[in-house]
Amino acid sequence: LHDQVFSSKHVALERESAGEFARRTLDQYEAAMYVRSNLPSEAHLLLIGESRPFYFDRASLSPYPFHEHPLTGWTREANSPKDLLDKIRREGFTHVILNTTEFRRLNAGYHLFNFTGPEAMRQDHILKQLPGNMTMLFSKNHVYVFEIPLSH
């Protein structure tokens, strides 16, 4: 069973295309193909819960899970979801990629966005409001592509 599900030998034997294999084994692949086909080449992506930027083929920030994500610091500094969105925009990002499945896995192991102290609940609330302040362009396999509005 492992060989049937994960093996790429079918690609080498030309029984399956590389794209079909990637689509079947990588949850972010179809979102990445959407980005490549629909977003301008100058798009700048902020990846959240996604540490595999290769297929997106756009300038991006995708921190390793064992490093603090810049979004953590920006959230601590923000007074509102609008402040956070404005900061992301000022940093030059045009789009956000959110992989919720991978985010949960990484957060469980690396505690990506664990806020502490008296402001923790407020900071968590600001971060959770972020998706609702952007425009969703694509969603599949729990991977979302958002556009950051020019103004809010």
Label each region the model flagged:
Residues 140-145:
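Short hydrophobic/aromatic beta-strand or adjacent loop that forms the aromatic wall/cage
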Residues 146-152:
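Short beta-strand-to-coil "C-cap" segments at the C-terminal boundary of structured domains/repeats
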Residues 36-41, 46-88, 96, 104-129:
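Extracytoplasmic
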Residues 128-139:
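Short secondary-structure junctions
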Residues 1-4, 100-106:
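Short, solvent-exposed beta-strand-terminating loops
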Residues 1-34, 50-53:
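Membrane-proximal, lumen/periplasm-facing interface regions of secretory-pathway glyco-
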Residues 91:
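Active-site charged/polar residues at nucleotide-handling catalytic sites that mediate phosphoryl
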